[in-house]
């Protein structure tokens, strides 16, 4: 049984905790850390497996009862919490983004690489779940067969029902970041450029939030992306992709079906 400690009991931290309880039989949440003791108490009561809690994340990370750590703290705390988690020598799952500035992202990425090279195995993963989705795995397989010819461009849709607490920056670092990651993985390629545009703001979005967001990106191979990101989408969650190749197209439809 893997004993998990979670840093942060907000939307993402509580979501991970509930998922572990309901869907991961060989893991259990034993420790929680947050500055909000009320949230800790509520989540502890809901889970029924928590052995201890603390407002000090370092204390949780170094506790011998914890085998693995989930970092779901506010974005600006990811870098310091990653450093503490690395020092603990335990397996780590960190929510995206890795950092809130490019300088910090490069610095902590280098530290992670050095750490994993030293221990000789992968110790840190980030919250990019689409790589494990059977539909995306099938699209990756179909692209790799070459049966559809070389990809030329692709369209993406990432629309959330209601992203409570979303910020204009957060549309990139918390929502669109899933697109930036999954297409590097699907095409085994790296981004060359990404541009963003803002259409007319939705009246459903909170004041001050630039929503929706239009993205145009280009991978180093020349494959080009056109996508949209919506934080407050009235008709429900909607996540789709269409890859246009020289001999056909591959789609993940509204209902999670792969269409060719």
What do the PLM-derived regions correspond to, one by one?
Residues 161-224, 229-238:
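Rossmann-like dinucleotide-binding domain that binds NAD(P)(H)
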Residues 27-31, 67-69, 170:
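Short active-site oxyanion
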Residues 50-51, 88-90, 115-122, 223:
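A short helix->loop->beta-strand "cap" motif at the edges of active sites that frequently abuts
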Residues 71, 94, 100, 124-126, ...:
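Hydrophobic residues in well-ordered beta-strands that form the structural core
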Residues 129, 241-260:
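C-terminal glycine/acidic-rich active-site capping loop/insertion
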Residues 1-47:
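N-terminal Rossmann-like dinucleotide-binding module
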Residues 99-163:
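A contiguous active-site-proximal alpha/beta segment in oxidoreductase catalytic domains
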Residues 16, 49-111:
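Beta-loop-alpha module in the N-terminal Rossmann-like domain of NAD(P)-dependent dehydrogenases
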